[in-house]
Structures are given as C-alpha cells and as structure tokens.
Design a protein with these regions (language model features):
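Basic, glycine/lysine-rich polyanion-binding surfaces/domains
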Residues: 1-195
C-alpha cells in the first residue's frame, strides 16, 4: 500500500502568476514537504517530571512561547503550555519518543499522516502570510512558531529562516487543499514556482 500525500491532487510543478523576469529569491518557491515524523507531546497537569531533564535527538523541551528547539534533523515547536509539536526527518525517532515519554506523564500522538505541510521560500513570504492572517508577522523572528488562522483555516507557522524568508506551514490534512489554494492565490501577485 502506498501513501497519498495531502496535496497530491493540487500541487503541480511549474511557474505561476507574475513570474516573468523574476529570479532568485524574488520568485517564491512553494513545495509540499513529505515523509516527516510529526508528533504532538503534551505533559499531563499532574505530572511532576521536570521537562529540563528530557532529551530528544539532543534537544530539550522548552516551555516558553514562540520557542523552537532545533538541530539539522529535528525541530520542536512550542504549541502551548506543556504542549509541543516535534517535527523530524528521522522517522525512527518515534521509537525513542515512545521510550522517553511515559504514558503516566505524557500524551504522545503521531500526527504524521494527519497534517498537510507546505514550505514557502522567498522575499515576499511575509506579505503572502499577511494577506490571510491577523497575526503581525513583522514581529515573528527566525526559529519562532505560532498558531493562527489563514482565511479561517487553523494553521501553525514555523519560521525556518529570515534571509531569505522560509516558512513551514502545518494544517489539518482535511484543510490542506484549501490552505494550499489560499496561499497560492495570495502568491500570484509575486509569482511563484512549485517544486
């Protein structure tokens, strides 16, 4: 059995919108990110385990707003008080996570197949996000993440880089195509290339 990506029916390679005479970072690049391990980790209220003692792929959980812990393979996004979203290219990390987080203290949920993941890169990324979201993206810094809405679709934004801008967007798989259409529609003005 093969898996079908969340955007398989709508994401097609090519250049769209006002792409003529644009090169490098002036042309937005939009791609679907596949084959990621996505795990939600929530610490129970009655748990006494100090999160500072927990290590996953060399990273610590941090309970501070907007914070992202990261290395080359894994990013841990703060999702709320005692709530994190772990995203990794190392699919076998799920075994370590299962051993590290005891069921009596943490709820661990594999969300890998229930999310649509879109990467957007280029100089106009923030302008595209501003078109559909009420969040003030001018205040978002590199390696910060937020939860917000984009045209009434709940999504998570992870700012991977700021020179040039690169963001990773996460939405429920069932809203993936709608989010994708909203993002690509907003990107037409700047021109974009699907990879």
């Amino acid at each position: 059995m093969s898996l079908i990506s969340a955007l398989a029916n709508v994401h097609h390679q090519g250049q769209f919108g006002d792409f003529e005479d644009k090169k490098g970072d002036d042309l937005l690049k939009i791609s679907e990110k596949k084959n990621l391990l996505i795990v939600q980790i929530v610490q129970f209220k009655n748990s006494n385990i100090p999160i500072e003692s927990i290590d996953i792929d060399g990273l610590k959980l941090k309970d501070s707003p907007l914070n992202v812990s990261f290395n080359d393979n894994t990013r841990i996004l703060w999702n709320g008080p005692k709530n994190w979203l772990l995203v990794s290219s190392k699919k076998d990390l799920i075994n370590d996570i299962s051993l590290t987080f005891k069921e009596t203290d943490f709820a661990v949920t594999d969300l890998s197949h229930s999310r649509a993941v879109i990467d957007i890169e280029g100089n106009h990324v923030i302008e595209v996000l501003k078109k559909g979201s009420p969040f003030n993206f001018d205040e978002l810094k590199k390696n910060n993440s937020i939860n917000s809405l984009y045209n009434n679709i709940a999504f998570t934004v992870d700012l991977l880089n700021d020179k040039p801008f690169k963001v990773r967007l996460f939405a429920l798989r069932s809203f993936g195509e709608s989010l994708y259409h909203s993002i690509t529609d907003a990107a037409l003005e700047f021109g974009y290339e699907n990879k």
